[in-house]
Design a protein with these regions (language model features):
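PLP-dependent aminotransferase-like
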Residues: 1-20
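Short helix-initiation/N-cap motifs at beta->coil->alpha
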Residues: 16-19, 61, 204-206
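ALDH superfamily catalytic-core signature
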Residues: 25, 31, 37-183, 246, ...
Length: 292
């Protein structure tokens, strides 16, 4: 690999169940860093424990995005859309803000504006076409999983604002899907979907927003929209997430530590802080003259 001496960067090709398992169990490897599902992360931890390897895990997420009624409304709508359906990833990003909580005083207004944002900015098509903003899902298995979760939302009584089905008759394309009137125990609220599906629910107070945001087994990312910076920092302190954006979403910088709380992982990637996970601390004591 360009820029590195021979032998520093080595690539082992193969499927995770074979190549990944062998790497995790190998006694000559001291450190494992993994990005992927929570289930796979747990498996890696078990195998790594046999040789007491150090592990860094960045796993699942179900990130909240909170919009207060004193936020810059237009920007909040655009960033909220970006957080789940923007950037050309169709929700296929671990920090996707797939749970949007909007203060009840602007809830209906936000729903209308978000719906319009989806309609006006969605161009479904070939991902290699520069005009396309919404491409296919990564695989047939993921495509089917997303549609199954969307159907569960319908059957559990969530209100479908837009989307909710396949797009076209070719490829693994799914319509941008927005649910309203959801309940905390619904699958679409609790499970990571990893697709273009978002739930939008109202909240009343600051404490209510924090409680709803933390009502998840994950804690990877969160976003907060308010013009009151003191309030933003209070909420950021109360939200259980490794990364918190204030008045933005998904704009993580490579120099800033990244990782999660709870089932979203262990340790941090990126930034100088992450380098410590690849080092060992050694204490060397030198006797400068003490005699026994």
């Amino acid at each position: 690999m360009a820029g590195f001496p021979a032998g520093v960067v080595n690539i082992v090709n193969g499927c995770g169940a074979e190549a990944g398992s062998a790497i995790t169990a190998h006694p000559g490897i001291d450190k494992i860093a993994f990005t992927g599902s929570t289930i796979t992360g747990k498996t890696i931890m078990k195998k790594a424990s046999e040789t007491l390897k150090s592990v860094t895990l960045e796993t699942g997420g179900k990130s909240p995005l909170i919009v207060f009624d004193d936020a810059d409304f237009e920007q909040a709508v655009k960033w909220s859309h970006c957080g789940i359906m923007g950037l050309g990833n169709m929700g296929q990003i671990c920090t996707a803000t797939s749970r949007i909580f909007v203060q009840d005083t602007i809830y209906e207004k936000f729903l209308e504006a978000f719906h319009e944002q989806v309609k006006s900015s969605t161009v479904i098509g070939d991902p290699f076409d520069e005009n396309t903003t919404h491409g296919p899902q990564v695989s047939k298995a993921q495509y089917e999983k997303i549609l199954s979760l969307i159907e569960s939302g319908k059957s559990e009584g969530a209100g479908l604002l837009t989307g909710g089905a396949r797009s076209g008759d070719k490829g693994f394309y799914i319509q941008p899907t927005v649910f309203r009137d959801v309940k905390p125990n619904m699958k679409i609220v609790r499970e990571e979907i990893f697709g273009p599906c978002v739930v939008i629910a109202p909240f009343s107070t600051e404490a209510d927003a924090i409680e709803r945001a933390n009502d998840t087994e994950y804690g990877l990312g969160a976003a907060i929209f308010t013009e009151n910076l003191r309030k933003a920092h209070r909420v950021a302190a109360g939200v259980q997430a490794g990364t918190v954006w204030i008045d933005s979403s998904q704009d993580t910088h490579w120099g800033v530590p990244f990782g999660g709380y709870k089932k979203s992982g262990i340790g941090r990637e990126l930034g100088s802080y992450a380098l410590s996970a690849y080092t060992q601390v050694k204490a060397v004591h030198v006797n400068m003259g003490m005699k026994l």
